[in-house]
Design a protein with these regions (language model features):
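A short, surface-exposed alpha-helical micro-motif characterized by mixed small hydrophobic
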Residues: 109-111
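ABC ATPase "signature
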Residues: 127-128
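Conserved catalytic motifs of ABC-family nucleotide-binding domains
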Residues: 63
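Conserved ABC ATPase "signature" region
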Residues: 19-37, 146-147
């Protein structure tokens, strides 16, 4: 996985020596909670949660200020999702990171996002502070999403309320 994590360094910092690249890879693995001695293994030798940490290390090795995360917790069991969310929170706090977080999992969005945009068919239907949207969704679509995510009884989208 060393080559995978170091790939961005080859592109963005090509003057780094091999030993400097390796040091950055080791630091990135430590940062995401993986033992650096594992860096000589292949991706298929890692669990889903470890692979997600490797993906995060690929970004962190470049010392970013902004990270785009597309479904970073999908296909992970609940305990591993919680670990990844905790890692992302810690990295955000430690490095003052801004995230663009794309997810269908509203529980994870609620855990991480300060601001939120709800989209339907490629169009924005609601946006604002996450706490406000979760507390008082304005559109029927957002209400239905919240109900589905949090198992709340609600009328179907498009139903007429009395």
């Amino acid at each position: 996985i060393t080559d995978i994590i170091a790939e961005g360094l080859l592109v963005h910092e090509p003057k780094l020596s091999p030993s400097e690249r390796d040091s950055r890879v080791v630091a990135a693995l430590n940062e995401v909670g993986l033992d650096p001695s594992l860096r000589f293994r292949y991706p298929h030798e890692f669990s889903g949660g470890q692979r997600q940490r490797i993906a995060i290390a690929r970004a962190m090795v470049l010392n970013p200020r902004f990270v785009m995360l597309d479904e970073p917790t999908s296909a992970l069991d609940m305990s591993v999702q919680a670990q990844v969310v905790d890692l992302l929170r810690r990295l955000q706090k430690t490095h003052q990171l801004a995230y663009l977080f794309i997810s269908h999992d509203l529980k994870v969005v609620r855990a991480l996002a300060n601001e939120m945009i709800v989209m339907r068919n490629g169009k924005i239907v609601e946006q604002g502070p996450s706490a406000d949207i979760f507390a008082r969704p304005q559109t029927d679509y957002t209400k239905a999403l919240m109900a589905a995510a949090f198992n709340i009884e609600t009328a179907p989208v498009g139903a007429v309320s009395e």
